[in-house]
Design a protein with these regions (language model features):
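Phosphate-backbone binding and catalysis cores of DNA-processing enzymes
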Residues: 1-153, 157-167
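Glycine-rich, small/acidic residue-mixed loop/short-helix segments
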Residues: 314-376
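Short, cationic-aromatic polyanion-contact patches
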Residues: 98-104, 190-209, 264-280
Length: 376
């Protein structure tokens, strides 16, 4: 599994975390379900993290794997297609996210309105003026109402037949616009694709909207459940909201918070509302293999404590690669050529940690239902 062509210490090395960094990393690992009791269902993972980046389907599923026990990628597909308990849509920061269906409408209302201006600009660059974009959004709604679920190709075919240009990036931003307007979400799997469906049909009518203070309080509380300890700037960056909104949400739940000497805030009670039990400090997570765009790299302003000097090997051109985590730090990268896990270590790890990563590699293959290599 380990790449024999790569030196075991390809980088300059990643200095051990300071005691303070280790404490914060361990707390966040518990919040992220990377330490402590694993989730039993995909919906529990999505509920704890609130939103999992979903532009890479395999990466989103691997984020569920590493935070749960005994699940498979097929279980995530079942939640998307049969149970309708999970959906994928453009939300925070204008990025596709996997979320619980119950959390879709609150997140949509909070994080998407400010994205329409940028979407209109990009559509204009694709030669689609506002009136044509409005018409296309209406057509998408009509086609999904009549024929949905529809794959990307099926939707493009219908739009083209109606005289709507879909070449270049036009289709991407037209479906983005329909999502921002609450018309469509990506729900069921058709083959290996996430098909588009009408949001109101797939999820039901949107519930009554709370006032903004209540909504921002909900967001702050849910964010901290999966990301504490954190700062107001961490929340603002993760949600793609102005800092003033993050502050407003945190102020609304101030009686529920503990602020440490490090300036980081935490929920005073467990995410389920029970009192925090006194006990030893949480331990750093066990060695694991994390997939592309893993939430551990997207929940806070800084990724330095996790990636250290290895960031150039893991983050390239805005793409966040798969990486190996040991002691709360990235120590290598990994890939799946031919369905086999290939691990490239960027620094030395102990034999025990290497064996743990190899064991986790087998679980990756189990989760993805990859065929075992043929024996000779």
């Amino acid at each position: 599994m380990t790449n024999p062509a790569a030196p075991p210490c390809a980088g300059a090395g990643h200095a051990s975390l300071t005691a303070a960094q280790a404490g914060v990393t361990a707390e966040r690992a518990v919040a992220q379900l990377l330490s402590g009791p694993p989730a039993a269902r995909a919906e529990q993972v999505a509920g704890r993290l609130l939103a999992i980046q979903g532009q890479d389907p395999r990466g989103a599923r691997l984020a569920v794997r590493v935070r749960s026990q005994g699940l498979s990628a097929a279980d995530v597909d079942h939640a998307l297609t049969v149970d309708r308990s999970l959906v994928i849509s453009w939300l925070n920061r204008g990025t596709l996210h996997l979320v619980r269906s119950a959390d879709y409408w609150p997140l949509h209302r909070l994080t998407t309105p400010q994205l329409e201006t940028g979407c209109a600009r990009r559509l204009g660059q694709e030669g689609i003026p506002p009136a044509a974009a409005d018409r296309a959004a209406g057509l998408i709604e009509r086609f999904l109402d009549r024929d949905g679920p529809l794959t990307r190709a099926q939707l493009a075919e219908r739009l083209e037949s109606a005289g709507v240009r879909t070449q270049g990036q036009a289709l991407v931003f037209l479906t983005f616009l329909a999502s921002l307007r609450g018309i469509s979400v990506r729900g069921p799997m058709i083959g290996k694709q996430h098909a588009y469906v009408l949001a109101r049909d797939w999820l039901g009518a949107p519930p009554a909207a709370p006032d903004r203070d209540t909504a921002l309080a909900w967001l702050a509380r849910r964010y901290l459940a999966g990301h504490a300890p954190a700062t107001e700037r961490d929340l603002a960056k993760w949600a793609g909201l102005p800092l003033r909104d993050a502050r407003r949400g945190l102020r609304a739940i101030a009686p529920e918070l503990d602020e440490g000497q490090d300036g980081l805030v935490r929920l005073a009670r467990e995410p389920d509302g029970t009192a925090r039990a006194a006990g030893p400090e949480p331990a750093l997570p066990l060695p694991r293999l994390l997939g592309v765009f893993d939430p551990l790299l997207h929940g806070w302003q800084s990724r330095a404590a996790v990636l250290g000097p290895h960031e150039p090997e893991i983050v390239r051109g805005g793409m966040f690669g798969s990486f190996a985590l040991v002691g709360g730090r990235a120590v290598g990268t990994w890939s799946l050529p031919g369905g086999q896990v290939s691990l490239t270590l960027l620094e030395e790890v102990s034999p025990a940690h290497r064996r743990a990563l190899e064991t986790d590699a087998e679980d990756v293959r189990r989760f993805l239902a990859l065929a075992k290599p043929a024996t000779r």
